[in-house]
């Protein structure tokens, strides 16, 4: 089984995250990147 992705790490979809939530957030460059909540 794969380990879950932690908060603020890039994620492909909600199910990948330990929190079960992956949303778009702005990075330092102002780009929208999906990261775990």
UniProtKB/Swiss-Prot annotation:
It comes from the Eukaryota. InterPro entries: Omega-atracotox. Keywords: Calcium channel impairing toxin, Disulfide bond, Ion channel impairing toxin, Knottin, Neurotoxin, Secreted, Toxin, Voltage-gated calcium channel impairing toxin. One of its GO terms (biological process) is defense response. One of its GO terms (cellular component) is extracellular region. Expressed by the venom gland. Disulfide bonds join 4-18, 11-22, 17-36. GO terms for molecular function: calcium channel inhibitor activity; toxin activity. Pfam families: Omega-toxin (PF06357). The record marks 10, 27, 35 as: Critical for insecticidal activity. It is found in: Secreted. The presence of a 'disulfide through disulfide knot' structurally defines this protein as a knottin. Inhibits insect, but not mammalian, voltage-gated calcium channels (Cav). Belongs to the neurotoxin 08 (Shiva) family. 01 (omega toxin) subfamily. This is Omega-hexatoxin-Hi1c. It comes from Hadronyche infensa (Fraser island funnel-web spider). The lineage of its organism: Eukaryota, Metazoa, Ecdysozoa, Arthropoda, Chelicerata.
